[in-house]
Amino acid sequence: FIGKNWKIVEQFIAMMIQHPGVKIRWACVFTSVEGGGKGLLASLVSALLGHHNCNTQLNFDQMVSKHSNVLLGLQFGVINELDLSSKKNIKSNTNQLKKIISDPILTIELKNKPQIKIPNFANFFIYSNDDDCLYLTKEARRYFITTIKHEQAMIEKRLEEEGYKDLIVDALEYNSDQLCYLKDYFENVVIEDHKMFQKNAPKTEDFYDLVEKSRQGIHRTLDDRFYSNQYPFESNGE
C-alpha cells in the first residue's frame, strides 16, 4: 500500500532494529482513510523492538503536555489520529512536535519535581486520517510523508480476502516463527546511508502535496490568479 516509499520505511525500521538507541532526526508520517492498516504496521514494529520499549497509542496532547513523562525510556512511538489543522494555531503546534522528533536532549518537568534533562532516543511514526494534518512549508525537514491512496474497500480486500491480515496477526504472537523470520529479515537489510537518518527527511511527491494543502487559502488564490494572468496580476505583455 505504501508503494515506492516503502524503501525508505524499510530502512527506517531496519535502523531501529540494528542500532537501538540511535536517534533518527525525522519521523515517518502516514495518512490514509480510516482502516488503512496503519495499526497493523505499528503493532509489528512494536513486536520486533519489544513492546516494553514502545508506545503505539500516543496522542499530540500527551507529547506536549508540561508534565508528560511518556518519552522516558521510549525507543519507538506512534502518534495517532494527528490533526493539527483542527487546532487554533497549527503552525505553532507543528513546531512543538518538531522539537520532540528531532532534538537529542529534552527538558521535562515531572509533576512536583524540578526540571531535568533526558536523552531522547525515541523515533516516531505519525498516523492521521487527514492529509492536511500538519503545517508544512517547502523547507520543512523533519517529516517523511506517505499518503496511502487506496480506498478502504481495496485495503480491506487485500488484508482480509488475500490473507495478509492473518499473516500479520500470526506474526504478532510472542516468539512466533513468522516474527523471528521478520526480525531476521530486518537485521539483514543493508542500510545504504547511515547519515541519512541525521539529515533532512527525504522529500516525496506526497510531501509537496501536503505543503500545498498547508498554504492558506488566500495564498493559493493569489498564486492561481498570478499564473493565470488574472486580476490583480493581469498583464498585456508590457
Give the role of each language-model region.
Residues 1-79, 93, 144, 182, ...:
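P-loop NTPase catalytic core of nucleic-acid-dependent motor ATPases
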Residues 27, 86, 113-116:
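Conserved nucleotide-state-sensing and coupling region of NTP-binding domains
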Residues 83-84, 129-133, 149-154:
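Conserved nucleotide-binding/hydrolysis micro-motifs of P-loop NTPases
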Residues 75-101, 133-140:
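Conserved AAA+/SF3 P-loop NTPase catalytic/coupling segment centered on the Walker-B
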Residues 67-72, 109-127:
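AAA+/SF3 P-loop NTPase mechanochemical coupling elements
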Residues 119-121, 136-213:
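Phosphate-sensing "switch" segment of ASCE/P-loop ATPases
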Residues 50, 92-116:
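Conserved catalytic/switch belt of AAA+ P-loop NTPases
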Residues 34, 192-238:
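DNA transaction DNA-binding modules
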